[in-house]
Amino acid sequence: LVTSPVPMNPSKIVCVHLNYSSRVEEFGARLPKAPTYFLKPPSALIRSGEPVVRPRGCRYLNFEGEIVAVIGSRCRGIEPEDAGRFVAGYTVGNDFGLHDFRDTDAGSMLRVKGSDTMCPVLEPVVSGWDFRGRGIRTLVNGEVRQSGNTDEMQWDPHYLIADISRTHTLLPGDLVFTGTPAGSRPVEPGDEVAVEVDGLGRLVNPVVAAEWGIPEGYGAQPSESEEVRSTALGGDWEYRGVRPPRPAAR
């Protein structure tokens, strides 16, 4: 195995929605026939040890521990069996989301998934790492909140990379987030969130409260609704105190 720095200036960060079977079951959702994706802006990137910032007025800041594929060379229109040749390596990521904006940003996910500090990534990249049969865990203050295995993935990283490349040219340094297992929940300022992946390492970030709030008087504001709660709180119906609806996945 060989390690190298993670490029912190990718042209794009592509994230898959549902991929792990436990996450699909948690939502009572149907697995789509093909992967669906959203983008995070590079400005959301932070390193291990740097704080994830929750704006004032927001309550539903969720973690999602993930494995991240780092593109090593330009690719377009490749086949899944060839995708490994275009991967520089893998690392650990945390696909944080501000679900308080889900009611207004459900289409683009811009503020939900792309706000500042919503994309912690571990350095370095590990090349020669085999993604099959690997454990992934997310811990909050030392307590395991997510625990899964890459064998749960419906589409492995090579499939995802090839699929994305059918319509988007992937460039060196681009990041592909490959999905999260069940157990994503909100965290609070003062919490410490760690993501561990067998053979890749441990990504750790503290959660802090922003000194600034979302300016009022214009633009969308953080909100709370059954849709927000159903996404942020997953299967915790008793905690939410509401009758479970049929939630939309992520």
Describe each PLM feature range.
Residues L1-R59, F63, V228-S230, W237-R246:
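Extended, compositionally biased flexible segments
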Residues P5-M8, A29-L31, Y37, A44-L45, ...:
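Solvent-exposed alpha-helices and their adjacent loops that cap or buttress functional pockets
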Residues V24, S48, I78-P80, D100-R102:
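Short helix/loop capping segments that flank catalytic or ligand/cofactor-binding pockets
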Residues L1-P5, R23, H99-R250:
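Catalytic-pocket segment enriched in acidic/His residues
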Residues S11-V14, P35-Y37, S43-A44, P51, ...:
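Structural motif
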Residues T36-R54, R76, T117-P124, A182-R185:
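Short catalytic-site patches enriched in acidic/histidine residues
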Residues E64-N94:
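RNA pseudouridine synthases
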Residues F38, V68-S73, V121, I161-A162:
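Short, conserved beta-strand element in jelly-roll/cupin
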